[in-house]
A protein has these predicted regions:
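Catalytic-core segments of class I nucleotidyltransferases/pyrophosphorylases
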Residues: 16-19, 48-148, 159-160
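Short, solvent-exposed polar/charged micro-motifs at secondary-structure junctions
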Residues: 6, 36-39, 116-120, 153
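Conserved beta-loop-beta/alpha segment of the NTase-like Rossmann-fold superfamily
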Residues: 1-45, 70-73, 78-82
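Aromatic (phenylalanine/tyrosine) cluster motif
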Residues: 3, 192-194
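N-terminal glycine-rich phosphate-binding loop and ensuing alpha1 helix
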Residues: 9-10, 121, 195
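Short, amphipathic C-terminal "tail helix"
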Residues: 155-156, 161-187
Length: 195
């Protein structure tokens, strides 16, 4: 799974707070044209999950569950009680269904300003790669530049970023990091994440 959009870090931080405050698990949904290819979430107007269906023939919504989950600490005990599926695997769907049965599962639906890219097949991985290439080529901005993210979040300072630039050397990536260091790129909160 790949996620790209404005404010992703804020969404993640808010989700941690939601789970801690409400003691409920949280999943995310993304509108798709072909929900039968995915796990589908149905919810009420308050974001409470009503149902989860895996690749339904007649989906109850167009929102696919995107594979990003937040759980309260009780998930440890929940996971210990999960039985292997018919495929002899412990399934995350079983964990989510356990929280659903207890009415402790909420969903946040990503809006149209956010992109979720499923990369579970060769074709979808190619589509995701082409998407990334197009964005980077058109904007000149890097997607998922770990040094940029670390710098903007305050995990490294300007001196450390400069040390990294010197280590990388004189190339396109190094030039991009110089622009970040010098404040030329000031696009805030556009993050990309692989999950």
């Amino acid at each position: 799974n790949m996620f790209y959009g404005s404010g992703f870090t804020k969404i993640l931080k808010r989700s941690v707070q939601d789970v801690e405050k409400n003691n409920k698990a949280k999943v995310f949904g993304y509108y798709v044209n072909n929900p039968s290819r995915y796990g589908v979430v149905e919810n009420d107007e308050k974001g409470n999950v009503i149902s989860l269906e895996e690749k339904p023939k007649n989906p109850k919504s167009n929102y696919a569950v995107v594979g990003l989950y937040f759980y309260p600490n009780e998930v440890i005990q929940t996971a210990k009680n999960i039985k292997p599926s018919q495929r002899r695997e412990l399934e995350i769907t079983s964990v989510n269904n356990s929280f659903l049965k207890e009415k402790k599962l909420i969903v946040e639906l990503f809006d149209k300003n956010f992109t979720w890219l499923d990369s579970g097949t060769h074709e979808s991985m190619l589509e995701a790669s082409n998407y990334i290439h197009t964005i980077e080529k058109r904007t000149g901005l890097k997607i998922a530049c770990i040094e940029e993210i670390a710098y903007k979040l305050g995990y490294i300072n300007k001196k450390k970023l400069n040390d990294i630039i010197n280590y990388i050397g004189d190339n396109q990536y190094g030039e991009y990091l110089k622009k970040i260091k010098d404040g030329i790129w000031k696009v805030e909160n556009w993050w990309f994440s692989f999950m």
